[in-house]
A protein has these predicted regions:
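Hydrophobic alpha-helical segments, chiefly the membrane-spanning helices
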Residues: 2-321
Length: 321
């Protein structure tokens, strides 16, 4: 009887920790979104720019940490697989779930600059990886793309601010900067910590229930490092912060390929793992599907969200065939 009671105790512990992790992720996403929106209004910066920079970088910390440590240990090929899977998840699941939660308006600048760049860096990674490895020179080139992206982003923002003649009265009612930054830090910590608890204990429960390691890896763990982006984008969409919801996912895509892989290659040139044609096709094609969904009515509704989620379901199905 003791092994049985030990099994039940362990399973209940995993369930409790999973619920705690879920609560931390949701609470962290709420605080992080409030902090990011407040910083945008306080500094008179658009939510799109905040989403593409601070929020995208903050929610991509799991990918950055995993990839950097993999490169330092000489397991760089793990980094590429992590980034490819994460970007497919970002485009299809995060934006799809956000559109299902609330209608998202798509600005022309988001369509023609951000979605196009997300598509472009995916193509660049594919072309760089055709020879089976990424060199330090290619890593430096990726970092250069990221630097150009940031420069153009803030240059366009400065131009927009010069065209504004009035300062919004809303800034008077915003929390002080130190409090907003505290929200950001606490939010990121809760997202990362809660995500770890959720993923680890969900994986343990899956093993208890006899789910195979491959299924755990392709579902729970693959989406695990993208949980912060998912929670933040869905919460932002429900709060009406469309630019923040889209900017977070697209910014993470750009950040993952240019900065994360760029840094990893500078630290340690890596070999590209045997990424299948299906993975490359969905990495690039997911951006095409998103662009088509967005350009038809310049907004993403439940229909478009369902299409994106359906594409991810098709991707998972193909992985098992």
């Amino acid at each position: 009887m003791q092994p049985f009671f030990k099994f039940i105790r362990n399973m209940l512990t995993n369930i409790v920790l999973l619920l705690v992790g879920t609560a931390l992720v949701l609470w962290g996403a709420d605080k992080f979104t409030d902090g990011a929106c407040g910083v945008a209004r306080r500094w008179n910066v658009s939510e799109l720019v905040i989403g593409l920079t601070i929020v995208a970088m903050g929610t991509s910390l799991p990918e950055l940490i995993v990839s950097l440590f993999s490169s330092i240990r000489g397991s760089g090929d793990m980094s590429v697989g992590n980034i490819v899977g994460s970007n497919i998840f970002n485009t299809l699941v995060i934006i799809g779930a956000s559109a299902m939660a609330m209608k998202i308006a798509v600005s022309r600048i988001t369509l023609y600059r951000d979605i196009s760049l997300s598509f472009g860096v995916a193509v660049v990674l594919f072309l760089m990886g055709r020879d089976g490895e990424l060199s330090r020179v290619e890593g430096i080139l990726l970092l250069g793309v990221f630097a150009c992206f940031l420069y153009n982003l803030f240059a366009a923002e400065r131009k927009n601010k010069k065209n504004q003649t009035e300062v919004s009265e809303q800034t008077k009612d915003i929390e002080p900067v130190w409090k907003l930054l505290l929200f950001l830090v606490i939010g990121v910590a809760s997202l990362v910590g809660g995500g770890q608890l959720l993923v680890n204990n969900a994986a343990e429960l899956a093993r208890f229930w006899g789910v195979s390691e491959s299924v755990i890896g392709l579902t729970i763990l693959a989406g695990g490092t993208s949980l912060p982006e998912l929670a933040t984008s869905v919460v932002a969409a429900r709060k009406g912060s469309n630019d923040l919801a889209l900017g977070n996912a697209l910014g993470s895509n750009i950040f993952n390929i240019t900065l994360v892989l760029g840094l990893c290659n500078v630290i340690s040139p890596m070999r590209i793992p045997l990424i299948s044609t299906t993975d490359w096709a969905f990495l690039i094609g997911s951006n095409v599907v998103l662009a088509v969904c967005a350009i038809t009515r310049m907004r993403l509704c439940r229909i478009e969200g369902f299409v994106l989620l359906l594409c991810y379901a098709a991707y998972l199905t193909l992985l098992f065939v």
